[in-house]
């Protein structure tokens, strides 16, 4: 296995769009798709953004010893679970790219080690992030504003300065100008790929 480039950031930081654009510019990176029990959103595709599964499938993977890390969020719509499974995606020699949370990054770092897991933390000023989140939610057929607010507040705790420091996150990519942010990330990944 090559390196795993792991994108993270608070909700509405632009990480999903950045992830897609980085994959376009670096097609040699293979993707890791994580799992979730939450409902699929408009515009998402099963197996692309996430594998959308139910609790029964999660239990099967747990019993098979395949779940690397698991997070549960008590949302206003019930408990949503997100997890990474060692389901064959990590068996390749390719460099990989994934998207997740700081919590999942810490667990994956324990599983794979510092040498293999490269953090890419995307930062956006909170006011701009809230504005983006609200615009995105308004476009949904059934906007979930309460959940948007819960996520926004939870992110403040989940991505606190102390937690970023404890996780060893020292570099931040500021997403003020998305094209510039993407260029910086692509350059950083290319440099790390050369030192494998």
Predicted regions and their residues:
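P-loop (Walker A) phosphate-binding loop of NTP-binding proteins
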Residues: 10
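Walker A/P-loop
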Residues: 15-16
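Conserved phosphate-donor/acceptor-positioning beta-strand/loop module used by diverse small-molecule
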Residues: 96-101, 112-135
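Pre-Walker A (Motif I) flank of P-loop NTPase domains
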Residues: 1-4, 93-94
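Short beta-strand-centered segment that lines the nucleotide-binding/catalytic pocket of NTP-utilizing
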Residues: 28-41
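Small-molecule kinase domains that catalyze NTP-dependent phosphoryl transfer to phosphate-bearing small molecules
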Residues: 139-189
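ATP-dependent small-molecule kinase phosphotransfer cores
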Residues: 38-96, 100-102
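Hydrophobic anchor at the beta1->P-loop junction of P-loop NTPases
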Residues: 7
């Amino acid at each position: 296995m090559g390196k795993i480039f792991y994108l993270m950031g608070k909700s509405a930081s632009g990480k999903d769009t950045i992830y897609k654009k980085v994959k376009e510019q670096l097609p040699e990176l293979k993707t890791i798709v994580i799992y979730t029990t939450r409902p699929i959103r408009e515009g998402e595709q099963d197996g692309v953004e996430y594998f959308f599964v139910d609790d029964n499938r999660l239990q099967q993977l747990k019993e098979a010893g395949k779940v690397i890390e698991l997070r549960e969020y008590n949302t206003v719509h019930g408990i949503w679970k997100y997890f990474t499974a060692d389901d064959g995606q990590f068996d390749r020699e390719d460099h990989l790219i994934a998207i997740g949370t700081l919590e999942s990054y810490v667990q994956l770092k324990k599983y794979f080690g510092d040498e293999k897991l490269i953090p890419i933390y995307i930062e956006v000023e909170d006011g701009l992030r809230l504005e983006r989140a609200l615009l995105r939610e308004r476009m949904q057929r059934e906007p979930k504003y309460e959940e948007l607010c819960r996520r926004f507040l939870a992110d403040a705790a989940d991505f606190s300065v102390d937690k970023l420091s404890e996780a060893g996150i020292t570099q931040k990519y500021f997403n003020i100008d998305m094209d510039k942010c993407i260029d910086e990330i692509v350059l950083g990944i290319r440099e790390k790929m050369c030192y494998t």
